[in-house]
């Protein structure tokens, strides 16, 4: 069984083809991705209407690219999967519409996939896939959650952000420092030149006793510190010396990473599990990986990540999630081609609503 996956939830258009071979893990045959970063840079963030229009332009050429790379044709597709949510409504509608039209034209069933489940299962595409059960840290621009994962579709929410996500804290802090979009990676690069102990910033909810996160207060603290530094020099934040900006970037990153790492260790301790899966765009952060590796090593915990190019939104994770749901019997594909999307869709609702 071959599953074509289409991802269009935000500002990346992704298409991939995976193959299910018996009971072993599905195999990625080919994938292609187009990022809209350059287009959105002029606006300092994602413009939903522009994102939707660009998905329309890219999705079919990417599909042709994937089929050519895999040596397959449209006739070889058995199921067409797409991101149903969460995400930008207009962007989701593009992927859903193309997938359902393609399924109807080919007479093949379709399957809507939860975007976060795609991230959650993306490490199964790596050379060192995890085994169930495990604790998962889902950390991206829009979501920060800790989950207990006992199998495909068997997810228990342990904790989540009560305000900003970690990726949002990276991005908004970067904007406060005058860094270009996308801010998170820019802040991390600048942080490599800085002293993480230069500024004392808060670690919200670090000692709360639960596994929830909060990053809004940290973002405010970064803003206050940046304005204070600028006022002391009678200038703008952007005019601050590069080393000062680097120190503030490093201090910001250190605060975010410390919270993520310590909460993850607490989750492992509370569940007595010995595997940690890290997924989502922030999972590519080198400082986060280094500290998680160190702390997990002390505890005899195996930590798994997606391949770096699969940390961002991509079609491979959508195809893989669909294939694993079908393979495990969690869900059947549908030959009903009327579709809807769910811009807001808690992962905890997945089993009940699928």
From Swiss-Prot:
One annotated GO biological process: tRNA threonylcarbamoyladenosine modification
Top-rank taxon, per record: Bacteria
Cofactor binding mode and count: Binds 1 Fe(2+) ion per subunit.
Keywords carried by this UniProt record: Acyltransferase, Cytoplasm, Iron, Metal-binding, Transferase, tRNA processing
Needed cofactors: Fe(2+)
Pfam families attached to this UniProt entry: TsaD
Catalytic reactions on record: L-threonylcarbamoyladenylate + adenosine(37) in tRNA = N(6)-L-threonylcarbamoyladenosine(37) in tRNA + AMP + H(+)
Residues that bind substrate: 138-142, 171, 184, 285
GO cellular component: cytoplasm
Family annotation (CDD domains): ASKHA_NBD_TsaD_bac
Compartmental location: Cytoplasm
Keyword flag Cytoplasm: yes
InterPro entries registered for this protein in UniProt: ATPase_NBD (IPR043129), Gcp-like_dom (IPR000905), KAE1/TsaD (IPR017861), Peptidase_M22_CS (IPR017860), TsaD (IPR022450)
EC number: 2.3.1.234
Gene3D superfamilies per record: 3.30.420.40
Positions of Fe cation binding: 115, 119, 313
Keyword tRNA processing: yes
One Gene Ontology term of the molecular function aspect: iron ion binding
Family: Belongs to the KAE1 / TsaD family.
Chain's role: Required for the formation of a threonylcarbamoyl group on adenosine at position 37 (t(6)A37) in tRNAs that read codons beginning with adenine. Is involved in the transfer of the threonylcarbamoyl moiety of threonylcarbamoyl-AMP (TC-AMP) to the N6 group of A37, together with TsaE and TsaB. TsaD likely plays a direct catalytic role in this reaction.
UniProt-recorded name of the protein: tRNA N6-adenosine threonylcarbamoyltransferase
Gene giving rise to this polypeptide: tsaD
